[in-house]
Amino acid sequence: MRDMAQIRNIVVLSGAGISAESGLRTFRADDGLWEDHRVEDVATPEAFRRDPDLVQRFYDERRASIMAAQPNAAHRALARLDREWPAELLIVTQNIDDLHERAGAARVLHMHGEGLSAWCSACDARHHWTGTLRDEPPCPACGARALRPDIVWFGEMPYRMDEIFAALARADLFVSIGTSGAVYPAAGFVQQAKSCGARTLELNLERSQGSHGFDETRLGPASERVPEWVEDALGGRPC
């Protein structure tokens, strides 16, 4: 990979692997939630219409898990990069937790929604939410009992794609951390960035399905590989 001195704009994509080390289980990992619930039962609009109580209970549990988790060394390293990187940096996360923000990162975009947010299908308002949704509480904005988890379910369009593609077009470096490379559109970001001239780096516990598309892959736990890379990016100063 070329000298980081030539890199200005960076897009980081973070996936399940970065939060797994904080104890948050995912659909895609071997110990993931899919072992307990089929995706079709808890993560689709059809599932919510069919059994809203099950879906609300499922995300109430996810919300509690998020609040109990703590950022790890990878989150803290990216927060440091966010503070100290002098040019454009965008952290695009597939995760619904707030561990990037709690570690101190500000330039974060949640393409799949946020576990600590509720969306009202009646008035389109979004609210920070730490309690339960199972008992159908009223929307604080309009009073309708139409709140659901502010999550992008399978079959729905990810959030803020225009902003993501614009950032990828400007990127000099695209870094993917802890992703499976199996879920689109995020799995296509590496090719999108490369087509616009960016260099590409994968940091992952094991090679993803899209590893062949990266200029470089560094394998190992995110809590080790990410601080190492951030140290390199910031000129060798230890995290």
Regions picked out by a protein language model, each given a short descriptive name:
Residues 1-239:
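Conserved catalytic core of sirtuin-type NAD+-dependent deacylases
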